[in-house]
């Protein structure tokens, strides 16, 4: 096949002209005419010759000249021509081709592709003339074209488009088509190629291959719906259930019995209390449903005139069974509404507004009234009845009395009349005050005379009449109180004014106003009470104990001879002799092991947290501020325990500090320091360097010896020449007397003792002291501060002020507080000491162990008094010999305790003469005054054990005094069964103790006999051993035999 291609001349205008025709001669072959074709060319001002090239196989090409150039050349000369346009404008000249030569066809296709690629390469290389790639032409507002640079975003989008275009596959127009023939039943080449180039969908966009099951929609025709409706109506009628038909309108249906037949009743508007022109709104669907309903409402028996009456409203009947004159009906059924002039009206038809008021509706008003009455009566009647209710009063009389009560409480002409309700709201007409009082009197007399069995109704009316008559008419005093208290905002005058306004209202006062009046009266009473207390001497309400904000002046710390060049205190020889304190009563802190083990300061019945852990300071300010927060304890108000009085006046130096308003000053967090003695309780504290005993050693007082810090602070004011003697006196004499956790009174006495020998310590400043009223502890704060906050602050600042606690006539609870606690409290706990049952068990353990009991009595000399709870314990205490042992001991040690034990011994002898437990308890109760008098002479410390014993004896005395009066009057006292149970329990405990004593005794005897037998056999001849062994066995049998 021969192909001739050409390119038409390129012009600036598009024209159409007939293709050139001519003759083409190939070698010696005869010339052949060219096929005439119509060619569309682009006209241009430049005329170029056309060349036609024809080649067959390997023969030389034949060039045919014409008036146009080649297509490639024309394309290169005109860069603005699009590839697609040049391709569309190319013309092909066909000549006669031999169809069997496939090689010629391949050359023809290759030339076409070569020309196409040349044109495409030229188009990609060309660029716009005069405008850069990153510029564009815009038109200004004045109509002038302007070249401006493209924005970075536009360039970015352009480059993206070019990248996408370059990535698209090149699809040639003359590409060979793939075969669609399938070989061997497999996929064809075109299908395989399409699958390879097909874009894969994302997984979430891949269509599901699951075959969905399409359910058939159940449809029912009108006949089926009617059949279903009839079946449902039958079922509901049988069960007397309610039906609600919901279409365009809602219809509610229930079933009632009339004339011994069950009818369907529709809820119409007038049954809900609404009077409308159309009593029931329905459409075609609703009317069709009502027609179906009418076939199952009632039966086919005709209903004669007069039968339809009140209570038939909304009932559905068929038109054929009504013989009375009736209105039209929108369907075959008839819904009864009411009657007017003997004519029945259907509820579905519309009547005039006038007629809607004239119609006598057939609603059962009385039935509705009793229905509402029964519902509310049953719902709101009280359940706190102590009897079973039955019908004992006449029902007619009950209804009459209920009507009279209704008229008395709610005077009206008709209970459904809204005008009567308005009169009652406005208190006018028949509901006015005088009218109601007159009516109440009449109705009360009627009930008294005609219904004598209803006395409760008369009482209710009497109370009601009294409430209406309770009017306050004392306007003169009301006006005077108003003139005195009005405008005065001081003290209780506003409460007086409000109370006066409430009292003048009389019977119209509400319960809430009565409650407010009581509150106002309470404020007035409080004002009078406070005013009376303020007048009294030594009242807590007037107690104010503000701390001085000025620091106490200590001359010792201001003397230049006592300070170094940095202003620090010089201990001198005092520092050397202070070793006696640090070596005996302080322990060394090892910072390498951390401060956690020292953070909690254990005291009896509680603990206090030190701030020693805050010595590690973080560099983060936020964390540092968090560290400056303390841990508050339970707050305690100002009570009698916070103050000290002398002849009725407050001793402020021996009291807790308060604010100006009288509230207690609560301690704040005390931050720690190293190697310092902190003194000063008022103003800013003073920090004194500790003596250099060992370099970089940190000391903390041992548990129970925190009061040593007081003596260390006193050492600052002691002369250096007296320091050795001072420290020896404290160590050898005072600390031995005080021991662990002494009372504040004992510490103050020790300070007075030191003041006698060393007067300079009188003005020595004390460390900070905090008061814990809950555990009755005085905390002496050292340089490690206190993380626990919320304690009261003791105002005592100097040794001289602390000595004031030693005054014998000082009334103070603080002087009995422990600077820690007692050993007895520490060992057993205050909760056990306060429990009489625990104390008597402790006494039972010592009944057969007199030495242990003697040790317990050293801490608590009143322990034997708990034997008064049980006659059996007293007898065992006497019979065991422990009482006699203690008497012999205390005759030499404390005669007052010996007298108390003698009284107990005489009581035990009296108890032993009686056989019954009740008689023995009466003997114990009669001896209580004598025991209390003997106890009062015992001089014991005012600690928890003493206070617990005082409460115990007071309890016994208060229980016994009423019994004495009854016995003196000749009455028999019936004891509770619990006394015998308690006695049996205590006797069991005594028996166990006795069994343990017997077992120990038996073991001791046996060991003694075995040792005697061994000793005899070692010293005597063999022939005498057997005889002696038999004697030992007989003695052992006699001694160890069980009874």
UniProtKB/Swiss-Prot annotation:
<keyword id="KW-0378">Hydrolase</keyword>
<dbReference type="InterPro" id="IPR042308">
    <property type="entry name" value="HC_PRO_CPD_sf"/>
</dbReference>
<dbReference type="GO" id="GO:0006508">
    <property type="term" value="P:proteolysis"/>
</dbReference>
<keyword id="KW-0941">Suppressor of RNA silencing</keyword>
<feature type="active site" description="For P1 proteinase activity">
    <location>
        <position position="270"/>
    </location>
</feature>
<dbReference type="GO" id="GO:0046740">
    <property type="term" value="P:transport of virus in host, cell to cell"/>
</dbReference>
<dbReference type="InterPro" id="IPR001456">
    <property type="entry name" value="HC-pro"/>
</dbReference>
<dbReference type="GO" id="GO:0044219">
    <property type="term" value="C:host cell plasmodesma"/>
</dbReference>
<feature type="domain" description="Peptidase S30">
    <location>
        <begin position="219"/>
        <end position="362"/>
    </location>
</feature>
<feature type="site" description="Cleavage; by autolysis">
    <location>
        <begin position="820"/>
        <end position="821"/>
    </location>
</feature>
<dbReference type="Pfam" id="PF01577">
    <property type="entry name" value="Peptidase_S30"/>
</dbReference>
<feature type="short sequence motif" description="Involved in virions binding and aphid transmission">
    <location>
        <begin position="672"/>
        <end position="674"/>
    </location>
</feature>
<dbReference type="GO" id="GO:0052170">
    <property type="term" value="P:symbiont-mediated suppression of host innate immune response"/>
</dbReference>
<keyword id="KW-0899">Viral immunoevasion</keyword>
<dbReference type="GO" id="GO:0008236">
    <property type="term" value="F:serine-type peptidase activity"/>
</dbReference>
<dbReference type="GO" id="GO:0004197">
    <property type="term" value="F:cysteine-type endopeptidase activity"/>
</dbReference>
<dbReference type="Pfam" id="PF00851">
    <property type="entry name" value="Peptidase_C6"/>
</dbReference>
<comment type="similarity">
    <text>Belongs to the potyviridae P3N-PIPO polyprotein family.</text>
</comment>
<keyword id="KW-1031">Host cell junction</keyword>
<keyword id="KW-0645">Protease</keyword>
<keyword id="KW-0720">Serine protease</keyword>
<feature type="short sequence motif" description="Involved in interaction with stylet and aphid transmission">
    <location>
        <begin position="414"/>
        <end position="417"/>
    </location>
</feature>
<keyword id="KW-1090">Inhibition of host innate immune response by virus</keyword>
<feature type="active site" description="For P1 proteinase activity">
    <location>
        <position position="313"/>
    </location>
</feature>
<feature type="domain" description="Peptidase C6">
    <location>
        <begin position="698"/>
        <end position="820"/>
    </location>
</feature>
<feature type="active site" description="For P1 proteinase activity">
    <location>
        <position position="279"/>
    </location>
</feature>
<keyword id="KW-0945">Host-virus interaction</keyword>
<dbReference type="InterPro" id="IPR039560">
    <property type="entry name" value="Potyvirid-P3"/>
</dbReference>
<dbReference type="GO" id="GO:0075523">
    <property type="term" value="P:viral translational frameshifting"/>
</dbReference>
<protein>
    <recommendedName>
        <fullName>P3N-PIPO polyprotein</fullName>
        <ecNumber>3.4.21.-</ecNumber>
        <ecNumber>3.4.22.45</ecNumber>
    </recommendedName>
</protein>
<feature type="active site" description="For helper component proteinase activity">
    <location>
        <position position="706"/>
    </location>
</feature>
<keyword id="KW-0813">Transport</keyword>
<dbReference type="InterPro" id="IPR031159">
    <property type="entry name" value="HC_PRO_CPD_dom"/>
</dbReference>
<dbReference type="Pfam" id="PF13608">
    <property type="entry name" value="Potyvirid-P3"/>
</dbReference>
<keyword id="KW-0916">Viral movement protein</keyword>
<feature type="site" description="Cleavage; by P1 proteinase">
    <location>
        <begin position="362"/>
        <end position="363"/>
    </location>
</feature>
<dbReference type="InterPro" id="IPR002540">
    <property type="entry name" value="Pept_S30_P1_potyvir"/>
</dbReference>
<feature type="active site" description="For helper component proteinase activity">
    <location>
        <position position="779"/>
    </location>
</feature>
């Amino acid at each position: 096949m021969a192909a001739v291609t050409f390119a038409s001349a390129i012009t600036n205008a598009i024209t159409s002209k007939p293709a050139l025709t001519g003759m083409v001669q190939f070698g010696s072959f005869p010339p052949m005419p060219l096929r005439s074709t119509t060619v569309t060319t682009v006209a241009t001002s430049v005329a170029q010759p056309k060349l036609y090239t024809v080649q067959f196989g390997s023969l030389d090409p034949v060039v045919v000249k014409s008036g146009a150039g080649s297509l490639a050349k024309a394309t290169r000369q005109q860069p603005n021509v699009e590839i697609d346009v040049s391709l569309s404008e190319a013309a092909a000249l066909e000549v006669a081709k031999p169809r069997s030569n496939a090689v010629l066809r391949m050359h023809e296709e290759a030339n076409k592709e070569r020309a196409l690629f040349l044109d495409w390469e030229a188009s990609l290389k060309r660029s716009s003339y005069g405008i850069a790639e990153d510029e564009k032409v815009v038109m200004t507002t004045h109509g002038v074209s302007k070249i401006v640079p493209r924005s970075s975003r536009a360039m970015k989008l352009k480059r993206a488009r070019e990248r996408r275009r370059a990535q698209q596959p090149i699809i040639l127009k003359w590409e060979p088509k793939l075969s669609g023939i399938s070989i061997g039943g497999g996929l064809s080449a075109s299908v395989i190629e399409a699958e390879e180039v097909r874009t894969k969908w994302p997984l979430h966009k891949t269509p599901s291959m699951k075959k969905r099951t399409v359910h058939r929609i159940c449809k029912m025709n009108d006949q089926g719906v009617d059949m279903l409706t009839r079946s449902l109506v039958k079922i509901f009628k049988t069960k007397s259930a309610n039906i609600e038909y919901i279409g365009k309108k809602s219809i509610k249906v229930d079933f009632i019995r009339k004339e011994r037949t069950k009818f369907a009743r529709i809820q119409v508007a007038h049954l809900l209390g609404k009077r409308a022109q159309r009593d029931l709104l329905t459409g075609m669907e609703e009317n069709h449903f009502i027609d179906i309903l009418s076939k199952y409402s009632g039966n086919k028996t005709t209903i004669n005139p007069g039968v339809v009456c009140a209570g038939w409203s909304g009932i559905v009947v068929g038109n054929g069974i009504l013989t009375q004159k009736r209105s039209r009906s929108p369907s075959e059924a008839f819904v009864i509404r009411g009657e007017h002039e003997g004519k029945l009206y259907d509820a579905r038809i519309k009547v005039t507004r006038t007629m809607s008021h004239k119609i006598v509706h057939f609603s059962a008003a009385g039935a509705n009234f009793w229905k509402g009455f029964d519902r509310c009566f049953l719902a709101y009647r009280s359940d706190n009845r102590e009897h079973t209710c039955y019908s004992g009063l006449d029902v007619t009389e009950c209804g009459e009395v209920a009507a009279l009560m209704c008229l008395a409480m709610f005077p009206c002409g008709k209970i459904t009349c809204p005008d009567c309700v308005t009169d009652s709201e406005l208190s006018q007409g028949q509901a006015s005050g005088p009218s109601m009082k007159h009516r109440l009197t009449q109705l009360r007399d009627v009930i008294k005379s005609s219904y004598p069995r209803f006395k409760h109704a008369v009482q209710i009316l009497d109370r009601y009449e009294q409430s209406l008559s309770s009017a306050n008419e004392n306007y003169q005093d009301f006006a005077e109180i108003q003139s005195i208290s009005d405008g005065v905002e001081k003290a209780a005058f506003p409460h007086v004014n409000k109370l006066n306004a409430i009292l003048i209202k009389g019977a119209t006062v509400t319960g809430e106003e009565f409650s407010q009046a009581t509150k106002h009266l309470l404020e007035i009473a409080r004002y009078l009470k406070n005013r009376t207390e303020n007048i009294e001497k030594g009242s807590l309400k007037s107690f104010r104990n503000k701390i001085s904000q000025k620091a106490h002046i200590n001359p010792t710390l201001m003397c230049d001879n006592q300070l170094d060049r940095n202003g620090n205190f010089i201990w001198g020889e005092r520092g050397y002799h202070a070793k006696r304190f640090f070596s005996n009563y302080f322990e060394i802190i090892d910072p390498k092991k951390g401060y956690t083990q020292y953070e909690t300061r254990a005291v009896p019945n509680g603990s206090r947290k030190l701030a020693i852990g805050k010595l590690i300071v973080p560099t983060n300010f936020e964390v540092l501020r968090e560290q400056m927060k303390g841990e508050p304890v339970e707050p305690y108000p100002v009570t009698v325990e916070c103050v000290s009085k002398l002849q009725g006046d407050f001793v402020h130096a021996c009291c807790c500090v308060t604010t100006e308003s009288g509230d207690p000053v609560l301690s704040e967090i005390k931050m720690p320091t190293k190697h310092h003695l902190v003194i000063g309780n008022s103003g800013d504290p003073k920090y004194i360097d500790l003596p250099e005993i060992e370099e970089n050693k940190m000391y903390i007082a041992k548990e129970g010896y925190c009061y040593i810090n007081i003596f260390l602070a006193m050492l600052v004011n002691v002369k250096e020449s007296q320091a050795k003697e001072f420290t020896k006196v404290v160590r050898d004499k005072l600390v031995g007397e005080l021991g662990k956790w002494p009372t504040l009174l004992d510490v103050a006495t020790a300070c007075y003792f030191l003041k006698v020998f060393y007067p300079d310590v009188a003005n020595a400043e004390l460390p900070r002291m905090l008061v814990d009223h809950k555990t009755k502890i005085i905390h002496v704060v050292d340089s490690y501060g206190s993380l626990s906050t919320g304690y009261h602050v003791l105002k005592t600042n100097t040794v001289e002020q602390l000595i004031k606690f030693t005054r014998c006539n000082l009334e103070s609870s603080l002087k009995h507080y422990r600077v820690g606690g007692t050993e007895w409290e520490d060992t057993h706990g205050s909760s056990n000491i306060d429990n009489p049952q625990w104390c008597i068990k402790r006494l039972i353990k010592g009944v057969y162990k007199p030495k242990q009991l003697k040790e317990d009595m050293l801490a608590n000399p009143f322990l034997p008094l708990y034997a008064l709870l049980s006659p059996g314990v007293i007898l065992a205490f006497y019979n065991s010999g422990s009482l006699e042992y203690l008497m012999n001991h205390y005759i030499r040690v404390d005669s007052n305790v010996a007298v108390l034990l003698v009284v107990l011994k005489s009581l035990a002898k009296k108890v032993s003469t009686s056989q019954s437990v009740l008689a023995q308890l009466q003997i114990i109760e009669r001896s209580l005054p004598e025991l209390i008098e003997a106890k009062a002479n015992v001089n014991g410390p005012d600690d928890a054990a003493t206070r617990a014993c005082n409460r115990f004896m007071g309890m016994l005395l208060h229980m016994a005094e009423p019994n004495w009066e009854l016995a003196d009057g000749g009455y028999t006292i019936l004891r509770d069964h619990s006394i015998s149970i308690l006695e049996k329990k205590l006797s069991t405990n005594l028996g166990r103790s006795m069994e343990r004593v017997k077992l120990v005794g038996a073991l001791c005897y046996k060991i003694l006999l075995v040792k005697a037998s061994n000793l005899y056999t070692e010293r005597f001849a063999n022939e005498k051993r057997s005889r002696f062994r038999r004697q030992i066995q007989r003695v052992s049998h006699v001694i160890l035999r069980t009874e």
